[in-house]
């Protein structure tokens, strides 16, 4: 079990690193090509304000999330808050996706995106459990 606790910070960093990469790619996609990104979901942007809103709502927020999560990679003491942040963001996004599927119907695009969201949510929860366990183990074995 000691081995697991020793490698937990690196496993959780891997999880946070994956989230950082995903949030960055999503953010950059919508900031650099909001019209193309929206068109892939059959959304048309009919004005400059609509394009800017797409850049901000779908690009800037995920990029901001990426920066927050990346900053949590730098210190072992910030791993758990980063994992909680990630679980919260992905959990809310997954819940909204499920709500959309229930209310609006199971569009293939929505179902396709649900899989990686659920996987990322599961990874973040596993990360929270591992890091919490590591901290508990550390407290009981150093006191």
Task: Please identify what each model-predicted range represents.
Residues 1-22:
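Cytosolic juxtamembrane helix and N-cap/initiation of the first transmembrane helix
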Residues 22-52:
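Hydrophobic transmembrane helix segments
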Residues 25, 89-99:
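Aromatic-anchored segments of alpha-helical transmembrane domains
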Residues 51-71, 88, 92:
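Core segments of alpha-helical transmembrane spans in multipass integral membrane proteins
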Residues 67-81:
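Juxtamembrane helix-break-helix junctions at the cytosolic face
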Residues 85-89, 113:
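Alpha-helical transmembrane segments of multi-pass membrane proteins, especially transporters
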Residues 106-117:
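Non-cytosolic membrane-interface motifs at loop->transmembrane helix junctions
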Residues 120-139, 143:
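Membrane-water interface at the C-terminal end of transmembrane alpha helices
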């Amino acid at each position: 079990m000691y081995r697991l606790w020793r490698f937990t910070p690196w496993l959780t960093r891997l999880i946070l690193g994956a989230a950082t990469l995903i949030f960055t790619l999503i953010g950059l996609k919508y900031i650099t090509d909001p019209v193309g990104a929206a068109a892939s979901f059959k959304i048309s942007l009919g004005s400059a304000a609509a394009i800017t809103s797409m850049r901000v709502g779908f690009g800037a927020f995920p990029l901001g999330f990426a920066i927050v999560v990346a900053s949590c990679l730098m210190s072992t003491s910030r791993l758990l808050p980063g994992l909680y942040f990630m679980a919260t963001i992905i959990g809310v996004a997954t819940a909204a996706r499920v709500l959309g599927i229930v209310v609006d119907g199971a569009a293939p695009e929505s179902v396709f995106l649900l899989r990686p969201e659920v996987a990322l949510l599961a990874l973040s929860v596993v990360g929270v459990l591992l890091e919490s366990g590591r901290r508990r183990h550390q407290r009981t074995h150093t006191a």
